[in-house]
Amino acid sequence: MAESNPRFPRSIESLQAKLTDQSGSNRALLLMAPLLAFELLVFVVPFFILLRISLAEESSDLVYAEGTWTLEAYSSVLTSDLIWSIVGYSFLLGIVVTVLSVLLGLFYAYAIWRSTGLLKSLLLFSVVLPLLTTLVIRTYAFNPLLAPSGTLNELLLSLGLISSPIQFVPGTIGVVIGQLYIVLPYAVLAIYSVLATMDWHVVEAARDLGASRPRSVLEVVVPQAMPGVIVAAVISFAWSVGAYAAPDLLSGNITFAMQVEGLMLSDMRYPLAAAFSVLMLLLMLVSIAIMFTVLNRIGGEFELA
């Protein structure tokens, strides 16, 4: 009588497990196919078109001189003092708005997380409400509010807090306020979505062990909320560096997006505009990578403190 092979059932089980894993991978890839196709058509293909234009010679009749290859546009961008001053202003605006949006977003998200009932609904509604209006309308509304004879200056003068009107707009202060108003709701929602998954009893346990309120927030809440903080920082920074509406409506200073518009629509220098865009994209990716690393280290230091 033939002896049964004890390895045979195990081989069957192993094969079934492999087939199940492969089926799950294929299903996941199939579900991701529409998103991958969207990313390919909307981001990857346009980027390579942009890169091709940046490597071509300029043409007075066409977008670029077809069949030409040159690094002249990149040379012009890298040696232009005007371009680098615009880069510096755009990144400075992005850094200031990002710091303010993360700090204010963290406080506001924490307030929503700890509130209950009607107050919580009102706080959430006040975050979502600005998103129900168009970007241009809610940005342009800051002109009568922040003008030298606007509502804010009149209020400060009537309270005796200032002796003469403050020049908010046109100016960088007005741009920071307007851009902060644009990105703050997204920062709040990103941070709150993480805080909403936290267990408040962990914070209470830290306080029972002797941690003060500020220390329990810094060492328990902030490290746990760091994924939301990173998302808020990336959104705020990328949007603010490439901002167009707020700088255009509230300031006379030229930003990256405004300069690209001028090069394309007014000067018809598409290769130069494309090279400037590629350079800014690379600088933003490097900056976001540095910011991601720094925020992760800060979160780790708070957690280990």
Mark where each language-model region is:
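C-terminal transmembrane helix and the adjacent membrane-cytosol boundary/short C-terminal tail
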Residues: 2-14, 192-207, 274-305
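A short amphipathic helical element positioned immediately N-terminal to and/or at the very start
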Residues: 18, 69-78
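Glycine-rich helix-loop "coupling/hinge" segments at transmembrane-helix boundaries
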Residues: 61-67, 243-268, 303-305
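Hydrophobic positions on the alpha-helical face of helix-turn-helix-like DNA-binding modules
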Residues: 205-206, 216, 260
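Glycine/proline-centered hinge or cleavage motifs at structural transition points of membrane proteins
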Residues: 209-211, 223
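Coil-to-alpha-helix initiation sites in intrinsically disordered, low-complexity, charged segments
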Residues: 3-14, 68-72, 150, 212, ...
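Membrane-water interface segments at the C-terminal ends of transmembrane alpha-helices
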Residues: 27-60, 75-77, 81-165, 169-196, ...
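Cytosolic juxtamembrane amphipathic/interface segments immediately preceding
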Residues: 15-29, 33
